[in-house]
Structure formats: structure tokens, C-alpha cells
């Protein structure tokens, strides 16, 4: 399941707003989880047949709300995504900037975390570009509490939230990343995304 949250986070980095039409339920979150298991099982069997699995926006956001809380990094809460199509994604999360500042702030006057404190809404939008088992993010816009922020600050947040035991240095928005579970590409359509293995 860990790669599923990473995949959602990747989509979310292109757009860190749930549509008002989405009704989120635990059942939809569970449906998302079952699909993740099926995608991983397909990868584990070493099957050579191609397979496409679609995840709806409601399933994705239900999973984030009901199933993924313990999988999210400390300091990141209430994530949600809107899938626009054309591989465009937007989304938001509440970020505890005090946690970010305590762990990685330089404390300098040019460090944005020196001025921003508390839990603030962060929004972003962009495109997810994938193919041949790799992906990258094309960031279009990001904001903290409605104020546009520079890409360097987005990179600082991404770097902080992507640090793991396997990736202790973290990542940036500009990094090319390998897609998990033998996924070759991801297509984002209005209200859903499809992974192709």
C-alpha cells in the first residue's frame, strides 16, 4: 500500500480540492485499496499481458480520507485531488509548517519557513508526465493560504515530505521518478486516472 500513497502524492505534487460532486465513503476507499492490491499482484506475477486499472477521483479521495491517514508523512493532513484530464491535476493539503521548519529550516531570512507558521492550506496544480515506466511533474502554480509561492519553496516542501529510509535525501518537483509495480504510464482524465502495466 505504501506505493499507492506515493503514487497519489506524486499526482498531488502536480496538484497539492475535492469536487463538490464527490461523495466520499469508506466503501470507495476500500475499492481503491482492492485495486491497488490487484495492480501489485499483477506486477508480482511477472505477467506480460498489458493491463489498465482505473481509479476514480472519489475512490482516490475516499482512500486518502478513510484509509491512508497512518501512511501520510507527519505534518501533512487532509490531502485531496481533482483530476482535470489531459494529465492535469490540482489538489490541496494542510501542511504543518512548524514541523517542516523544525526539521529542515535554515533559519535564514530568505527561508520562507522562517515567516510562515502553523497549519496552512497548500494548493498546487500541474501536469503528470509519464511513459516508459518513469514520470515527472510539470508544476504550473502553487499557493500557501492563497498566496502564490515560488517553485523553490515547493521543492523544499516536496523534499521534506518525500524523505524515507529508502530515499533519505528526498526528492524535488523536477526529479524523474520510477513508477511502481511495473506501471508503464498513467493517464489522467476528468475525474479519474488510469495506470497501465
Regions found by a protein language model. Give the residues of each.
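Extracellular/lumenal and peripheral-membrane lipid-interaction modules
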Residues: 2-6, 10-197
